[in-house]
């Protein structure tokens, strides 16, 4: 039996270097070894990639074809690491791709039924530093989507380029839907008024879980609060019901061509989408 999987070592731009070794012989996993030093504070990598794929079977540039068994292994490994460290965006990304086929099809169908969503599927816009004029966004009027999005990125020291390309979705159109969801995630933070700390991420995940039905979002919403202290849990008790109600009330957030709405005010866009006013929270 041929080797099914081998480890890939990734060093995302937002993470330091890691190393891991995975050996499969005779179709069986012989050893998984990771190296983690307390001084460096590095978490072990369990990124996998399919081997022996034919170039003719690739559906898009970053595609890595996988079978059901490989997807199961990827899902299990990435779920463990994502729960251990929710800031492992690479693990969260793999988990979303390997478990989200049903949800992605539903999202794709919602986009097809909406004029603006259909336009997005046809035009395939991308959100990255190569497609955005960040300086122009920074110079927009306060309160506009463009200005507040740029402010969010600057304050939290992130860029649109930190979103990994989709690899494990075995359908070209669904892969774009997954990529679009990933690239508008920071816009959800902006529209919901949530920072990138653990509290903010959990609140956004509750909103996205209701909106998308992606297992990865549901998992993050359910287990993310375990890492919050008592004070933040009290705030979460107010914010989660609001996020859930907003998610149910809102139109599909993938049906908005945000690149054409930079000059629209955040307040008016929130109303158009159906996001409820942010509740007051005691300090």
UniProtKB/Swiss-Prot annotation:
The EC number(s) given in the record are: 4.1.1.130
Q: What class of enzyme is it?
A: lyase
Q: Name one GO biological process term.
A: ubiquinone biosynthetic process
- Binding sites annotated in the UniProt record for Zn(2+): 185-186, 189, 201
Q: How does it associate, per the subunit comment?
A: Component of a multi-subunit COQ enzyme complex, composed of at least coq3, coq4, coq5, coq6, coq7 and coq9.
Q: Which PANTHER family match?
A: UBIQUINONE BIOSYNTHESIS PROTEIN, UBIQUINONE BIOSYNTHESIS PROTEIN COQ4 HOMOLOG, MITOCHONDRIAL
Protein name, per record: Ubiquinone biosynthesis protein COQ4 homolog, mitochondrial
Source species, please? Xenopus laevis
Output the lineage of the source organism: Eukaryota, Metazoa, Chordata, Craniata, Vertebrata
């Amino acid at each position: 039996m041929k080797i099914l999987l081998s480890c890939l070592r990734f060093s995302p731009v937002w993470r330091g270097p890691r190393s891991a070794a995975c050996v499969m012989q005779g179709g069986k996993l012989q050893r998984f070894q990771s190296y983690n030093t307390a001084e460096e504070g590095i978490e072990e990598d369990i990124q996998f990639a399919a081997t022996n794929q034919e170039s003719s079977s690739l559906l898009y540039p970053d595609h890595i074809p996988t079978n059901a068994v490989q997807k199961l292994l990827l899902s299990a490994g990435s779920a463990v690491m994502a729960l251990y460290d929710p800031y492992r965006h690479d693990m969260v990304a793999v988990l979303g791709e390997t478990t989200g086929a049903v949800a992605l099809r539903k999202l794709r169908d919602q986009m097809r039924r909406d004029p603006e969503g259909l336009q997005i599927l046809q035009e395939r816009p991308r959100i990255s530093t190569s497609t955005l004029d960040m300086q122009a966004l920074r110079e927009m009027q306060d309160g506009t989507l463009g200005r507040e999005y740029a402010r969010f990125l600057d304050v939290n020291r992130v860029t649109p380029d930190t979103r990994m390309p989709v690899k494990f979705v075995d359908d070209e159109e669904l892969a774009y839907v997954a990529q679009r969801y990933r690239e508008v995630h920071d816009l959800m933070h902006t529209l919901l008024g949530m920072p990138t700390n653990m509290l903010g991420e959990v609140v956004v995940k509750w909103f996205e879980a209701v909106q998308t039905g992606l297992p990865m979002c549901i998992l993050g919403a359910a287990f993310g609060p375990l890492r919050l202290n008592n004070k933040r849990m009290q705030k979460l008790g107010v914010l989660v019901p609001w996020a859930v109600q907003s998610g149910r009330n809102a139109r599909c957030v993938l049906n908005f061509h945000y690149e054409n709405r930079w000059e629209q005010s955040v307040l008016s866009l929130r109303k158009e989408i159906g996001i409820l006013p942010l509740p007051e929270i005691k300090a």
